[in-house]
Amino acid sequence: MPKVVFHYFGAKGWARPTMLLAYGGQEFEDHRVEYEQWPEFKPNTPFGQMPVLEIDGKKYAQSLAISRYLGRKYGLAGNDIEEDFEIDQIVDFVNDIRASAASVEYEQDAANKEVKHEENMKNKYPFQLNKLSEIITKNNGFLALGRLTWADFVFVGMFDYLKKMLRMPDLEEQYPIFKKPIETVLSNPKLKAYLDSAPKKEF
């Protein structure tokens, strides 16, 4: 079995590829870098970003690329390129929602931030979230293919961050179907030991 190290800051973050490692039964070192250590660690990463997945000494980066790789490795990808296409498009769509909300929340001008947030609450988020709800409903509580895929792990890993960026602490109450993939992933017995020991600090 390869030596695997997952490098990230001392928080849950989003996407959480570690859940996929746990699902795959992969033993790994969960290396947490404190923020004061980051300037020293940063030059040793592929792109100066976190997270980093290290396999037998070689380092790889980008949350979604890592998740896609692990999904393929552990049987959570499509059975052909069209099924992979379906998974990729929904992952990109969920990430678009995250990115659009985050761009507003990280706006430095407070007044402009509120204007953009109100605009998105009126014109963007309802369409995006309703569409996502429709897709999960169509897929019987999963994000793609009507079965468990790595897209579900990305969605669940991102969900708390998404609620924060959208300013919707009751997001799963507004869209109850969102609870389905969350319950499916978090109740998986393969993840229990990892989830019990995983960082609780959010971001």
Swiss-Prot record:
Describe the location of the GST N-terminal domain by residue ranges: 1-78
Domain (GST C-terminal) ranges: 80-203
Q: Where does glutathione bind?
A: Y8, W38, K42, G48, Q49, M50, Q62, S63
**What EC numbers are recorded for this enzyme?**
2.5.1.18
| InterPro entries xref list | Glutathione-S-Trfase_C-like (IPR010987), Glutathione-S-Trfase_C_sf (IPR036282), Glutathione_S-Trfase_N (IPR004045), GST_C (IPR004046), GST_superfamily (IPR050213), Thioredoxin-like_sf (IPR036249)
Which molecular function GO terms apply here?
A: glutathione transferase activity
Gene Ontology biological process: glutathione metabolic process
Q: Which superkingdom, per the lineage? A: Eukaryota
PROSITE patterns xrefs:
GST_CTER, GST_NTER
Induction statement: By dietary chemicals.
What are the UniProt keywords, alphabetically?
Transferase
- Reaction catalysed by this enzyme: RX + glutathione = an S-substituted glutathione + a halide anion + H(+)
Q: How does it assemble?
A: Homodimer.
Q: Which PANTHER family match?
A: GLUTATHIONE S-TRANSFERASE (PTHR11571), HEMATOPOIETIC PROSTAGLANDIN D SYNTHASE (PTHR11571:SF224)
Q: Which family does it belong to?
A: Belongs to the GST superfamily. Sigma family.
Function, as annotated, reads: Conjugation of reduced glutathione to a wide number of exogenous and endogenous hydrophobic electrophiles.
Q: What is this protein called?
A: Glutathione S-transferase 2
Q: Which organism is it from?
A: Manduca sexta (Tobacco hawkmoth)
